[in-house]
UniProtKB/Swiss-Prot annotation:
Skewed-composition ranges (Acidic residues): 21-32
Compositional bias of kind Basic and acidic residues: 10-19
UniProt-listed GO biological process terms: translation
GO molecular function: small ribosomal subunit rRNA binding; structural constituent of ribosome
Organism the protein comes from: Haloarcula marismortui (strain ATCC 43049 / DSM 3752 / JCM 8966 / VKM B-1809) (Halobacterium marismortui)
Protein name as annotated: Small ribosomal subunit protein uS15
Subunit structure: Part of the 30S ribosomal subunit.
Family: Belongs to the universal ribosomal protein uS15 family.
Cellular component, GO annotation: cytosolic small ribosomal subunit
Protein origin, superkingdom: Archaea
Transmembrane feature ranges: none
Length: 156
């Protein structure tokens, strides 16, 4: 599949191993995994950071290579069940942070046309995602602006 804002081809990734159950050496109780996921979320980690921490550090010293194989649920599903989900979806939050960072850079460096275009592309992606999430995970009346992004991220 092609990239969104360039004429280049997309990048190919390696495939995840086809496995129906977690490896034998990773035999941690589902409840312990879910408790650790909620604990990491309360510490302020995003769902992808939680997955990385479980892969690297694990639960009770045992690494968890794939949360969905071990529990039958995705990290975001576990967070929703325990009412610990973030206020904004992770992909939208990352794009908003990038847009705020680029806008601050553009205020200091108005002649940086390369990053001006990067900001425009990022804002386009944000508007597209807001339309996708509107009503469910984003307020129905939310529209993108720099001030709204700063407020949504809590950077005021």
């Amino acid at each position: 599949m092609a990239r969104m804002h360039t004429r280049r081809r997309g990048s190919s990734d390696s495939d995840k191993p086809a496995a129906d159950e977690p490896p034998e050496w990773s035999d941690v109780d589902e409840d312990a995994i879910e408790a650790r996921v909620v604990e990491l979320a309360e510490q302020g980690h995003s769902p992808s950071e939680i997955g990385l921490k479980l892969r690297d550090e694990g639960v009770q010293g045992t690494p968890i290579p794939d949360v969905s194989l071990a529990t039958g649920k995705k990290v975001t599903e576990i967070l929703e069940e325990n009412e610990a989900e973030p206020d904004l979806p992770e992909d939208l939050r990352n794009l908003l942070e990038r847009a705020v960072r680029l806008r601050d850079h553009m205020d200091e460096n108005p002649g940086d046309y390369q990053n001006k275009r990067a900001l425009q592309n990022t804002q386009s992606k944000i508007r597209r995602l807001i339309d996708y999430y509107r009503g469910d995970e984003v307020d129905e009346n939310f529209t993108y602006s720099y001030d709204n992004a700063v407020e949504a991220l809590g950077l005021e």
